[in-house]
A protein has these predicted regions:
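Short, small/polar-rich loop/turn modules that mediate ligand/substrate recognition or access, typified
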Residues: 89, 175-182, 229-231
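A conserved structural motif in NAD(P)-dependent oxidoreductases
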Residues: 203-214, 225
Length: 244
């Protein structure tokens, strides 16, 4: 299938490894120009070198996307380097595990900043640029916890559902305004990433998803044929959730 996004400009945060890297590789395969952001300079340089070797134009910024000014800086970089911004993949690492009643206010606020407000800020910064030419695709990578809470991941459960509620509302606003911009969530279940290893889920390796496959799902949500997919939370979990 031709996704119709060759020569489009995409910004991917958290794009140096894991699910974000899967999205980067999938978009690069479609001929998309890339702006990559991550905190780890070495991993970011490696990802950029890989897509450059494949003939893809790329710009990078080493940045902590949870800082309030970071999203606007990234959008500005895309416009300065490539003249536009068409696609945003908002991805940030998950918060630490913990039981709900053990969490203090500071931990909850930090999770909301990283896994809700960071994406909100990025969307707000990107929409005016996309609306200028009447086309845009925004995909926030969250978690399958938006449909079924995951035990001991209370921070993630809370922040991800908050983002889902905000994004669903914002997607309807974008449609009502006739912007040509869609906003969707890609909600992964267990995938073979460093995050899963940190959570001690190595024993599940045989039943985990491949980040490369997940990246192709993200690329579809960011494609031209996905123009009628808006305000959706697409769960990619191999059937792990029991929620309808």
């Amino acid at each position: 299938m031709d996704l119709g996004i060759a020569e489009r400009v995409a910004l991917v945060t958290g794009g140096s490894r894991g699910l974000g890297r899967g999205a980067v590789d999938a978009l690069a395969a479609e001929g998309v120009k890339l702006v990559l952001a991550a905190r780890a300079e070495g991993a970011l340089a490696e990802a950029a070198a890989a897509v450059t070797a494949a003939g893809v134009e790329v710009a990078t910024m080493v940045v902590d996307v949870t800082e309030p000014e970071a999203p606007q800086r990234l959008v500005d970089l895309a416009v300065e380097r490539f003249g536009s911004l068409d696609i945003v993949v908002a991805n940030a690492g998950g918060p630490p595990p913990g039981r709900a009643l053990d969490l203090d206010d500071a931990a909850i606020m930090a999770a909301l900043n990283a896994n809700l407000l960071t994406s909100v800020r990025l969307v707000r910064s990107a929409v005016p640029v996309m609306a200028e030419h009447g086309w845009g695709r925004i995909c926030c990578i969250t978690s399958y916890s938006v449909v079924q809470p995951i035990p001991t991941l209370a921070l993630s459960n809370t922040a991800r559902v908050g983002l889902w509620a905000w994004a669903k509302t914002a997607a309807n606003d974008l449609a009502a305004d006739g912007t040509g911009i869609t906003l969707n969530l890609a909600c992964p279940g267990p995938h073979a990433t460093e995050r899963m290893r940190q959570l001690g889920n190595d024993s599940m390796a045989g039943s985990m998803g491949d980040p490369a496959d997940f990246g192709k799902v993200v690329a579809f949500l960011c494609s031209d044929p996905a123009r009628f997919v808006n305000g959706a939370a697409l769960v990619v979990d191999g059937g792990a959730t029991l929620a309808l």
